Amino acid sequence: MLRFPRAALAALLFLGVLAGCASVPAGHDPRPPTILISIDGFRADYLELGVTPELARLAREGAQGAIRPSFPSKTFPNHYTLVTGLRPDHHGIVDNNMRDPQIPGVTFALSNRQAVTDRRWWDDGEPIWVTAERAGLRTAIMFWPGSEAPVRGVRPSAWRTYDAALSPEARVGQVLSWLEAPRSARPRFLALYFEAVDTAGHHYGPRSREVKEALAQTDAAIGRLVRGLAERGVEANIVVVSDHGMAEISPERVIRLDEIVPAELGAPLTMGAFLTYYPAPGREAEAEAALVRSHPHMSCWRKSQIPAAYHYGSHRRVAPILCLPETGWEIATAESLRKRPIKGGDHGFDPYAPEMQALFLGYGPAFRRGTVTPLTDNVDVYPVLARLVGVALAENDGGPALAAAALR
């Protein structure tokens, strides 16, 4: 697997670590805690809507820019990329829904609690909390994908089982309570997750009143976190990211899969903003003939022929055939349309589409003030986190551009 040359990246980050530790007594590391916050579905340009004053202040007083999600621009693959620095094709969470020939009879899905907590799905990557725990640093995770499994045999010091009903205020309260521990027992790395913006974007579309309301609600929760830190005298580096953006979809922009390939030739696993397709045994050639050809508003490939720009197709969990529509077009069947009409918004589209760009924001003593960072791939967030936390890099696909632009 190709990787960014680790020697060069490690040297850059190590020099930063040394600079931050100069004249520090042995055995004492003054680094403040790092808090990683995900606002699921926060499109990069949402910051311009004028409904997030807390985030706007953090952006003015810190570093902010846009990041490009990894393919597919879905929730679980990109959340794991953010904390491992690996492309989905390398860390193994290649979709929200996937199969693995080494785990027969099981389909990984967000709703499959047994699969979500099974380390075998996650062990191809090393999230930063595992690296930190192995280095003797405490971590505390609130709802980050992967944190409910003992990845590579390691769990965070503290973590919570995902509960969508838990209010943003309660989530912030839990993070603040973790930080009330004595300095020697305080977590070095914490993560926090909010999904309301993504939910509203799916149901109502990215420019809807409901999205603005969800943005305001989430922004208020982050404001409470910042004030709570100040009240407790806790200085922290805060990194706010999103996993992907959101694009408008419409019933006028639908590609009917059942009009392209007969049902007996195979079955889709994922449909919508992209398609993963499994031909029926013995019908592979017919399925490929139907799908892997020219289509209006859609491109299809065998997994071995997916364009290199997507860094996707080598992992055993990638489906045999992948189809990607133009951004804003949805792949569906008559049956799926009866269950879920096409409306609102979606993601999973080409990560190079502007609508898929996600937020990056860094605030705290380690960040340059008033800096706009260049558009980078989201694998570059991981080296920033490693530098902040003070841990060695695990194997990753990230580069130094974001760290160089954002950090002092």
Report residues per predicted region.
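Loop/turn elements at helix/coil->beta-strand transitions in domains of secreted/extracellular proteins
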Residues: 30-34, 61-63, 135-140, 185-190, ...
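Metal-dependent active-site segment of extracytoplasmic phospho-/sulfohydrolases and closely related
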Residues: 36, 54, 217-257
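A long, amphipathic alpha-helix that forms part
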Residues: 166-180, 190, 197-238, 385
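Short, structured active-site-proximal loop/turn typified by the sulfatase FGly-forming signature C/S-X-P-X-R
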Residues: 45-91
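Active-site neighborhoods of enzymes that stabilize oxyanions during catalysis
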Residues: 269-384
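His/Asp/Glu-rich, glycine-adjacent segments
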Residues: 86-205
